[in-house]
Amino acid sequence: MSLTRLLIRDFRNIETADLALSPGFNFLVGANGSGKTSVLEAIYTLGHGRAFRSLQIGRVIRHEQEAFILHGRLQGEERETAIGLTKDKQGDSKVRIDGTDGHKVAELAHLMPMQLITPEGFTLLNGGPKYRRAFLDWGCFHNEPGFFTAWSNLKRLLKQRNAALRQVTRYEQLRPWDKELIPLAEQISTWRAEYSAGIAADMADTCKQFLPEFTLTFSFQRGWEKETEYAEVLERNFERDRQLTYTAHGPHKADLRIRADGAPVEDTLSRGQLKLLMCALRLAQGEFLTRESGRRCLYLIDDFASELDDERRGLLASRLKATQSQVFVSAISAEHVIDMSDENSKMFTVEKGKITD
């Protein structure tokens, strides 16, 4: 599935844009503040319902406008799909697919699996566990049809349980929540464990190509003790949870530990090496999806040249081309991406929110 056309209206500093896109590489070149990252963010928002630079909707809608409008056309092997997303200042969204309203953002996410690589993406490696849980959950979402519903229900039950912890005095009063919570927690943890085990070889192979000087290891931590039933953990920790007023153990505390030569990667790797590792993990995840389902990812890469020397940029470019996926790359100068260009790619110039090809 590739995005063949993108319409943007009142998004960030872009008043209006109508872009015919390449199914291969699409380059967005412009000075800082020109709007090239806004194009990437518009694509991301079309597939996620939210921007990646700001959670405040008022900052995403163009100044003095009431809403942004995004439309796209997705070309699959057998059919074309029209998609649209409108969001106003109150945060109300409208999702349209093939001319019909009432759809969910999760449907857009399923139609447009994408990988985002930005200068801020180091949080996957040096940020809290929630970023690595999101990495695993992306894979589970695209691999397990029931994952999103289970994950949504888990979040709801945890919120209710945490609220109840402020009011109850005996564990028996929590059993109605835990009766629902326990099977969901165990199922989600099983899916995450299976996914991390399935993708482990892909991650190791790709990381070895990008960072041959290190031995990288990956271990999934489910969020509570090994060999212990979740029901036992919840009951045993009731008094502590009640004092904390939140549930201290469970799938919401899971992590994917990543080590280089036995040490945490954030303590061992340079910024350039961390970016290479981040790129390797995103590539491995996209390639794993393609092998498992036949679906290709869409890759968004902001500020391609930062932190990478010519050799590493060339390696990343060759691996991206090998995926045969659609790729969007922003850069300050065309010189940084000209070597990646071929007869099928498109080069867009971005200046003060205006986009030309």
Curated annotation (Swiss-Prot):
Biological processes annotated in GO: DNA replication; DNA synthesis involved in DNA repair; double-strand break repair; SOS response
Residues given in the record as ATP binding sites: G30, A31, N32, G33, S34, G35, K36, T37
Keywords of the record: ATP-binding, Cytoplasm, DNA damage, DNA repair, DNA replication, DNA-binding, Nucleotide-binding, SOS response
Domain of life according to the entry: Bacteria
Gene Ontology annotations for the cellular component aspect, listed alphabetically: cytoplasm
Primary location: cytoplasm
Gene Ontology MF term list: ATP binding; single-stranded DNA binding
Location(s), subcellular: Cytoplasm
Family membership noted in the UniProt record: Belongs to the RecF family.
PANTHER family per record: DNA REPLICATION AND REPAIR PROTEIN RECF
Free-text function comment from the UniProt entry: The RecF protein is involved in DNA metabolism; it is required for DNA replication and normal SOS inducibility. RecF binds preferentially to single-stranded, linear DNA. It also seems to bind ATP.
Protein name: DNA replication and repair protein RecF
Organism: Escherichia fergusonii (strain ATCC 35469 / DSM 13698 / CCUG 18766 / IAM 14443 / JCM 21226 / LMG 7866 / NBRC 102419 / NCTC 12128 / CDC 0568-73)
Chain's gene name: recF
